[in-house]
């Protein structure tokens, strides 16, 4: 029995008349990248989101509250919802059942005509038809009109007419599909964590909906996670602040509509210094911000300044806070739903609707102002926090000037310890951040000076999780990095000015090296996050061991490799093993051959796939709450490779 189907048979005039047809499907198999972005692992998972988005649309319209996603044996995907069921009556223009039109004609669906869905999610909106076209097999079961309807397809082509296969007292839709290996040549295997992260996010963004993910590929080890948040994004903010010290117990929360735009905002300040602002439009994470973010920021700054001056916490007009000051230590989520969202920007993740700015500004400012006057103690704490941030900003401005590099060609302002590369083309340039001066010397001698720059870092950099920007910019190692990268920092950050498109962290393979690596990643995440999002940050993989047998040398990168090599080698001639404790133990040639030569090296690219996990991990590892850190170490100690 399918658990997600609904007992309520409420079709509410959702029929073939609401299905609008725009164009044919022929192009989808020829040029799949145009419709789903790519045919890589990312594109494969996009197929799931296209089907899930349709179920979310039913939920947003008020007709579904349960969605189930199952990874079946052989990487089939099954998505079930308890909505009204896709219409099965004949669609007038095509003369075919509406469900068949939706699954075989590109851009045919309830989200395009305006009569079916008021608001719909999904960035591409390419819908079920493209999933069908890019699937080796697809099946649909519709529970509607007390009847179960069924149709099957191969590569988008119906195998038989829609037929009745049983009776039912439920409503809803079940779609099963298997991605076509001829199109997804890289992989057709789904990653549970990738699906889990987005499903949890969707459950937060659509409060009250229960979304279940189940992995049935291993019969003896079935995995299941179910997400249901009555608090919606309010619960999301509480989760993000879990390892922080909030300065008010409950997040400030608003959920209102104006001019057919639904606005939901949750905000909570904590004692830290980092800002964590996530924005969404129709469930799409708008990484590049947009008009909803602009309206929120404008209202926040104006209302806090107005309150600070009228309550005499701020003495004069000249004490006004900047936007950056008002957002210090703030965790906030903005989610809007719009009938016709306009996405722009480099990755189509920036909201462009100008009318949204005014609506968000008005709704949030009224609510926030009321909150401040009703909670004077919290209001004072927030304003005073902003005043402290303003003082730090003035101090940081002086320090920031020192880090400014006018352009990629500006050599005069470069830090003295930097051995820059001669190429001025950022796409081919890489900079190695090397632990210690001695290792820095070896890497400088062993590098390709045309494309590889070296910046030695002395000792551990500052833990930015516990510091304001003025203190951070007074740290010599951090200042040198900012100057070398050329991007600026914080509000001044500009990815287009990056001098290097590969920033490689190169530390010793011991506990100290791991700590320095974590400090650097914390700095990049908190103050230069676009570098990570653009895929510019890497971690070098220097060898752990050198195994010598006669004149033959083998470099080994982990214990598993070492065990494998030892089992394969002849016992004679006798071999010896040396463990590298640090980069400084390798000469220039060895460093080049094992760690820096693009032909042979292994680099780990740092990816940001789950903002919640990343934020919580950095806060827990580098923040003030010792108990959470201790628990993490105890839970993960079995995986650690400790070097005493």
Curated annotation (Swiss-Prot):
GO CC entries: chromosome; cytoplasm
Site (Interaction with DNA): 460, 463
Localisation: Cytoplasm
Record keywords, A-Z: ATP-binding, Cytoplasm, DNA-binding, Isomerase, Magnesium, Metal-binding, Nucleotide-binding, Topoisomerase
Catalytic activity: ATP-dependent breakage, passage and rejoining of double-stranded DNA
Biological process annotations from GO: DNA topological change; DNA-templated DNA replication
Record carries keyword Nucleotide-binding: yes
Residues that hold Mg(2+) 1 according to the record: 435, 508
EC number, UniProt record: 5.6.2.2
Domain Toprim: 429-543
Major subcellular location class: cytoplasm
Cofactor remark: Binds two Mg(2+) per subunit. The magnesium ions form salt bridges with both the protein and the DNA. Can also accept other divalent metal cations, such as Mn(2+) or Ca(2+).
Positions that bind Mg(2+) 2: 508, 510
Pfam (any one): DNA_gyraseB_C
Keyword Lipoprotein: no
Cofactor(s) in the UniProt record: Mg(2+); Mn(2+); Ca(2+)
InterPro entries attached to this UniProt entry: DNA_gyrase_B_C (IPR002288), GyrB (IPR011557), HATPase_C_sf (IPR036890), Ribosomal_Su5_D2-typ_SF (IPR020568), Ribsml_uS5_D2-typ_fold_subgr (IPR014721), Topo_IIA (IPR001241), Topo_IIA-like_dom_sf (IPR013760), Topo_IIA_B (IPR000565)
GO molecular function terms noted in the UniProt entry: ATP binding; DNA binding; DNA negative supercoiling activity; metal ion binding
Enzyme category, top tier: isomerase
PROSITE patterns for this protein: TOPOISOMERASE_II (PS00177), TOPRIM (PS50880)
Subunit structure: Heterotetramer, composed of two GyrA and two GyrB chains. In the heterotetramer, GyrA contains the active site tyrosine that forms a transient covalent intermediate with DNA, while GyrB binds cofactors and catalyzes ATP hydrolysis.
HAMAP family named in the record: GyrB (MF_01898)
Chain's role: A type II topoisomerase that negatively supercoils closed circular double-stranded (ds) DNA in an ATP-dependent manner to modulate DNA topology and maintain chromosomes in an underwound state. Negative supercoiling favors strand separation, and DNA replication, transcription, recombination and repair, all of which involve strand separation. Also able to catalyze the interconversion of other topological isomers of dsDNA rings, including catenanes and knotted rings. Type II topoisomerases break and join 2 DNA strands simultaneously in an ATP-dependent manner.
Additional remarks: Few gyrases are as efficient as E.coli at forming negative supercoils. Not all organisms have 2 type II topoisomerases; in organisms with a single type II topoisomerase this enzyme also has to decatenate newly replicated chromosomes.
Family: Belongs to the type II topoisomerase GyrB family.
The protein, known as: DNA gyrase subunit B
Native source species: Staphylococcus aureus (strain COL)
């Amino acid at each position: 029995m399918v658990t997600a189907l609904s007992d309520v048979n409420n079709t509410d005039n959702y029929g073939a008349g609401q299905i609008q047809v725009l164009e044919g499907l022929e192009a989808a198999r020829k040029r799949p990248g145009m419709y789903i972005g790519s045919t890589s692992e990312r594109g494969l998972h996009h197929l799931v989101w296209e089907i899930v988005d349709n179920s979310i649309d039913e939920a947003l319209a008020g007709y579904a509250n349960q969605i189930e996603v199952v990874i079946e044996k052989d990487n089939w995907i099954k998505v079930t919802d308890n909505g009204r069921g896709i219409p099965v009556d004949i669609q007038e223009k095509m003369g075919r059942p509406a469900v068949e039109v939706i699954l075989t004609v590109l851009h045919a669906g309830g989200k395009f005509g305006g009569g079916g869905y008021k608001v719909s999610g999904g960035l591409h909106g390419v819908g079920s038809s493209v999933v069908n076209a890019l699937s080796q097999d697809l099946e649909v079961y519709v529970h509607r009109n007390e009847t179960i309807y069924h149709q099957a397809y191969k590569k988008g082509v119906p195998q038989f007419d829609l037929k009745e296969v049983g009776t039912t007292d439920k409503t809803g839709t079940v779609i099963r599909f298997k991605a076509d290996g001829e199109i997804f040549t890289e992989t057709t295997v789904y990653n549970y964590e990738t699906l889990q992260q987005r499903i949890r996010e969707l459950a937060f963004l659509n409060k009250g909906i229960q979304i279940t993910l189940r992995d049935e590929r291993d019969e003896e080890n079935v995995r299941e996670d179910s997400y249901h948040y009555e608090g919606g994004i309010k619960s999301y903010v509480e989760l993000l602040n879990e390892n922080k010290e909030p300065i008010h117990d409950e997040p400030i929360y608003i959920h209102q509509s104006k001019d057919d735009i639904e606005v939901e905002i949750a905000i909570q300040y904590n004692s830290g210094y980092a800002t964590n602002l996530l924005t969404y439009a129709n469930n799409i994470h708008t990484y590049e911000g947009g008009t909803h973010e602009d309206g929120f920021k404008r209202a926040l700054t104006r209302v806090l300044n107005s309150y600070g001056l009228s309550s005499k916490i701020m003495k004069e007009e000249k004490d006004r806070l900047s936007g950056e000051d008002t957002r210090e230590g703030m965790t906030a989520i903005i989610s809007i739903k719009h009938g016709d969202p306009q996405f722009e920007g480099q990755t189509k993740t920036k909201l462009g609707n100008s009318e949204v700015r005014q609506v968000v500004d008005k709704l949030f400012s009224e609510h926030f102002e009321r909150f401040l006057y009703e909670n004077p103690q919290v209001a004072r704490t927030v304003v005073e926090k902003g005043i402290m941030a303003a003082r730090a900003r003035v101090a940081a401005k002086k320090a920031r000037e020192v880090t400014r590099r006018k352009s990629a060609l500006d050599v005069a302002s470069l830090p003295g310890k930097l051995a820059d590369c001669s190429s001025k083309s950022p796409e081919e340039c890489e900079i190695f951040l090397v632990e210690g001066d001695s290792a820095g010397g070896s890497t400088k001698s062993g590098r390709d000076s045309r494309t590889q720059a070296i910046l030695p870092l002395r000792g551990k950099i500052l833990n930015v999780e516990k510091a304001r920007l003025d203190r951070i910019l007074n740290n010599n190692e951090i200042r040198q990095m900012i100057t070398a990268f050329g991007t600026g920092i914080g509000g001044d950050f500009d990815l287009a000015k990056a001098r290097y498109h590969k920033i490689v962290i190169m530390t010793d393979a011991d506990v100290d090296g791991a700590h320095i690596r974590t400090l650097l990643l914390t700095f990049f995440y908190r103050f230069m996050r676009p570098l990570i999002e653009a895929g510019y940050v890497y971690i070098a993989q220097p060898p752990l061991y050198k195994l010598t047998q006669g004149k033959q040398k083998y470099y080994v990168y982990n214990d598993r490799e070492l065990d494998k090599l030892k089992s394969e080698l002849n016992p004679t001639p006798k071999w010896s093993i040396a463990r590298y404790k640090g980069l400084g133990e390798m000469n220039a040639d060895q460093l080049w051959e094992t760690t820096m030569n693009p032909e042979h090296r292994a680099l780990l690219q740092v990816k940001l796939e789950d903002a919640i996990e990343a934020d919580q991990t950095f806060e827990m590892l580098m923040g003030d709450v010792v108990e959470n850190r201790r628990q993490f170490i105890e839970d993960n100690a079995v995986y650690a490779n400790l070097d005493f």
